[in-house]
Structure formats: C-alpha cells, structure tokens
Amino acid sequence: MRYPEASSPLSSRQVREELGGADAVIVALDELDAAAISAGRNLKVIAKHGVGVDNIDVGRAALGGITVVNAPGMNSTAVADLVMGLLLALQRKIVDAHNSLLEGRWERFHGPELVDRTMAILGFGRIGHEVAKRAHGFGMRVIAYDPFLAPAEFERAGVERCEEIDAALAEADVVTLHLPSTGTGPLLGGEAIGRMKPGAVLVNAARGDLVDEDAVVAALRDGALAGYAADAFAVEPPVGRPLLTAPNVVFTPHIGAFTDHANELMGMSVVEDILAVLSGRAPRHPVIIKD
C-alpha cells in the first residue's frame, strides 16, 4: 500500500509515477486520464473517494476492463453544511469582518438575512435535498430545478418545482448549484447570469466548470451579481485567477466532503467495493457509462 503525501491533487504524470504495479487506486481530485490509466499495468479497480468522476477517464477504464466505483450519498450532509456556511459568510460578510477585526478596526458590516428570501437549487439530488432542509430551517422559500425528478419528489420535500432553469434564476435571491459537469461548457455563462434577479448571489459547491468564471467576475464588478461563493473552480488550485481578486467573494479549497464523518463513510465504502472487485464479487457502487 502506498499513500503519496501531497498538498494538492496529483497530476496525470504524478499519478503514473505512483501507480506502478498497483491492483487498485483510490483517488479524490487526482487526475486519472487515459495515460495514467494505461500506466497501471495491473490495475483492476479505480475508486473515487467522493461522487463526481470527471477527473477519471471512465471510458478508458472500461476499455481496459477496469471497474470504476464511487461513494454516492456519503458526503451529502457535509456538502450541504458547507453550502450554508458559505452563504452565511457571504451574506453577513463574516470573512471581511474577521479580517477587519484582526487589523485593529471595529467596523460594522451590514448584510441581508435569509428569512423570507428565495433559494433556487439547481440539481435536486441527495445534496440538493439536504440543502433544502437547511434553507427551510432558516425560513427560506425553496424552489428547485431538476429535469430527472418526478413532481412528487419536490412536493415531498416541500419545495416548489421549476420546469426551466431561467424561471429559477429570475425568482431566486440565492442560486446554489448541485449538478454534474455538463461536459459541453458552462451551464451558467454571461447570458444566464444576466437573467438572474438583480442583487442575487450564487453558490457553487459542485463543479467549477458549471460557471463561466470570467462572466462571474464581470457581473460582480458591475454589480449585477451581489456575491459569489465557491468550493469548486475551473482550474484547481486557482492560482492567479482573476476570480480571486473579485469583490464580494468567499472561497474554500474544495473541502465540501472534508468532514471526519463523511471521510469515514466514503473510505469504508470504497474499500469495501475494492475488496469486492478484487475477490470477484460485484461492487455496491459501480460507475456506469451512459450512452
């Protein structure tokens, strides 16, 4: 067993150097492209310590007879907690107030309350449901968009269903993203951001490429967007990106799933599935390629 020590995700080259004769590999945000997978001459199973597999070439793995597994549902509460933390930090200017106090100032920072405001959740899966519970606890009205869910699912959660993304954007004071990568470019580009309610804020704790970060910067600077909070970025780490110097932002380094409880659940899940594959049994959480 090898456990590379690194402060940031490993590149494809670094992964290739580490794989050697490994039968299994567990990755978080490390890059497993076709070249890295091909370097794993004995590789039988790739386990994602998380849910999204956009950093893994699942198609190349399938061609090589390599099983890919993930850990769905294990980090839902952890991510939902962080979403609300980011939102509160953004709205109540907690980071600005903290930094101001450390610099010796005693400033009063004003911001909106969440009660009676409307949150739009784009992508109403496990995490979206958990975010809705927390938003309801703050007295928010919650609307959601998810084309793959039956209307009854929204009703059970006490959430209003939006049939189109644009309808959700136009109504919401807060928009939070919980969708997989589109693979075809940003879901929210300049035009979509322009259709958001004036003074709205955007939270992205899903995938960095869901938003056009340059469009976000422009909207923040001209005041069309009141704030942006993110735990995911188009390039990670986002060193030197214009987004980092934009006004009214709060960021975390992709730590949505990083709680003790979530890490334990995900770790146990992927280890159990690795052992299943290596012993010839079917894993509980295989990643299936959709046509």
What is the meaning of each model-derived region?
Residues 1-69, 170, 189, 194:
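An N-terminal-biased, well-structured beta-alpha scaffold segment characteristic
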Residues 64-66, 72-118, 130-137, 283:
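Phosphate-binding beta-alpha-beta segment of Rossmann-like dinucleotide-binding domains, i.e.
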Residues 34-37, 147-242:
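Rossmann-like adenosine-cofactor binding region
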Residues 124-125:
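Glycine-rich Rossmann-fold phosphate-binding loop(s) that bind the pyrophosphate
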Residues 2, 143, 209:
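Conserved beta-strand positions in the Rossmann-like core of class I SAM-dependent methyltransferases
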Residues 68, 199-291:
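Rossmann-like dinucleotide-binding domain for NAD(H)/NADP(H)
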Residues 4-5, 49-50, 66-77, 146, ...:
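Short beta->alpha connector loops at strand-helix junctions that form conserved
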